[in-house]
């Protein structure tokens, strides 16, 4: 069966590295395929981004479906008030204690609650990782500004202190999911609730629409996509993505620069 004949499938799509490249160039060929598929299927963007910085891609695709933000910590439907919003947060007290106990090695940090952005300070280190457009920015000491639990948090440190911060955060691994990563010599520890994942969000959306998991497809390139790619029927990793998901995903497709998503649908027999 060709992709044009697909009907009542849930198709989950990561944004960065899947439909846009590292320079934010949009894969228009894949966008057009997704637009065509959205006529008879549920297209769900599944991203670590907040809503405000994924909204443009939701609108570009002209979607009428739920969206997964913060890697599953916030799931909502911008056009359907009957869809029950799902928000999972991290314990504020653990986050504040982590910051206090490691204040000598932390360079900067931020956390978000929907589109409220709590930031320790603005500097060149953090600028590439935050989207101020549409955000309600709250600056300063989190002990004074943060009044409730957040969707997640990102903490910046030096290379020499990276392992120390990871090891400390792992003391709370029963409550907090830790994702350490490095990007262009920036060392980051990302924190989420242990109960969040893109996979869990996808299964909840399948239940809402009464879609069998045999009718699920997902595309992604990062380690945060692994659970999503392994919970669906057709999990597709983008070439050039994280080595672990390339090993574990059932299918691979060319990179976003080579219009991998579009090529998969055009060449695959379902």
Q: Where in this protein do the model-derived segments appear?
A:
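Non-catalytic pre-domain segments flanking phosphatase-related domains
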Residues: 1-13, 32, 36
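Mg2+-dependent phosphoryl-transfer enzymes with acidic/Ser/Thr/Gly-rich catalytic loops
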Residues: 2-8, 26-27, 190-270
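Asp-based phosphoryl-transfer active-site loop
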Residues: 7-24, 45, 229
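Active-site metal-binding loops of divalent metal-dependent hydrolases
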Residues: 17, 49, 220-222
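Active-site phosphate-binding/coordination module
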Residues: 25-126
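Short active-site oxyanion
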Residues: 40-44, 63-65, 151-152, 214-215, ...
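Short, structured coil segments at secondary-structure junctions
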Residues: 61-63, 71, 171-173, 231-232, ...
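Conserved acidic, metal-coordinating active-site core of Asp-based
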Residues: 105-108, 112-219, 223-226
């Amino acid at each position: 069966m060709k992709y044009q004949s697909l009907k009542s499938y849930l198709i989950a799509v990561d944004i960065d590295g899947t439909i846009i490249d590292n320079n934010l160039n949009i894969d228009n060929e894949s966008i057009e395929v997704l637009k065509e598929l959205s006529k008879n299927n549920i297209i769900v963007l599944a991203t670590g981004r907040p809503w405000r910085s994924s909204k443009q891609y939701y609108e570009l695709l002209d979607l009428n479906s739920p969206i997964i933000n913060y890697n599953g910590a916030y799931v909502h439907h911008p056009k359907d008030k009957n869809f029950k919003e799902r928000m999972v947060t991290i314990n504020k007290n653990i986050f504040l204690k982590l910051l206090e106990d490691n204040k000598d090695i932390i360079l900067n940090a931020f956390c978000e609650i929907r589109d409220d952005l709590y930031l320790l300070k603005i500097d060149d280190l953090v600028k590439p990782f935050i989207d101020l457009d549409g955000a309600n920015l709250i600056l300063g000491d989190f002990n004074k500004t943060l009044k409730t639990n957040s969707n997640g948090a990102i903490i910046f440190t030096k290379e020499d202190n990276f392992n120390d911060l990871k090891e400390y955060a792992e003391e709370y691994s029963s409550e907090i999911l830790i994702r350490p990563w490095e990007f262009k010599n920036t060392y980051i520890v990302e924190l989420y609730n242990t109960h969040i994942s893109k996979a869990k969000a996808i299964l909840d959306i399948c239940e809402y629409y009464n879609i069998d998991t045999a009718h699920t497809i997902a595309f992604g390139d990062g380690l945060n996509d692994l659970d999503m790619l392994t919970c669906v029927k057709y999990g597709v990793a983008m070439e050039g993505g994280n080595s672990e998901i390339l090993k574990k995903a059932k299918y691979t497709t060319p990179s976003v620069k080579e219009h991998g998503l579009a090529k998969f649908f055009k060449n695959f027999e379902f």
